[in-house]
Amino acid sequence: MMLDDLKENMQKSVEATQRSFNTIRTGRANASILDRVTVEYYGTETPLYQLANISTPDATTIMIQPYDKGSMGQIEKAIQMSDVGLTPNNDGQVIRLNIPPLTEERRKDLVKLASKMAEEGKVAIRNIRRDAIDDVRKQEKNSDISEDESRGLQDDIQKVTDQFTDKIDELLAAKEKDIMTV
């Protein structure tokens, strides 16, 4: 039972790391880079994807079609204020974001950012492992389980931890390849 909870929590950490990776801009248009952009809309911070249809008509363009044309100014301002690093082009109907090709230096910076995100994911997994091992030791101390059972569980916990750490390494390798592909 405990290992299932452990796997579930570690899987959530892997998924959170994947979502973080999705916000990193590569050389290709990807609407998910706008996931963290919020727009002040009638006094409320609202996620951009709730205010507009976001599409990628080609590999270097993101097109934003607001449901309410009156919000175009706020959307444009929100994109400029965000960390996306793109300049919006507003033609009155849609807002276009042209994705410039990444420089070698920018690619290296993005790889460092991805590595940092991966490390944060691994830290979260190690924290889950630490909590699980603490629980096992507490059970052993309270004589709920034997020393051998405790060692076996701790070994199982470490194996699960290694599996999920490897998953994050695989995601990182794929993201690095994606970033460095010209």
Swiss-Prot record:
Signal peptide: none annotated. GO terms for molecular function: ribosomal large subunit binding. Pfam families: RRF (PF01765). Residues 136-157 are annotated as: Disordered. GO terms for cellular component: cytoplasm. The keyword Protein biosynthesis applies. Belongs to the RRF family. Responsible for the release of ribosomes from messenger RNA at the termination of protein biosynthesis. May increase the efficiency of translation by recycling ribosomes from one round of translation to another. This is Ribosome-recycling factor. It comes from Crocosphaera subtropica (strain ATCC 51142 / BH68). The gene is frr.
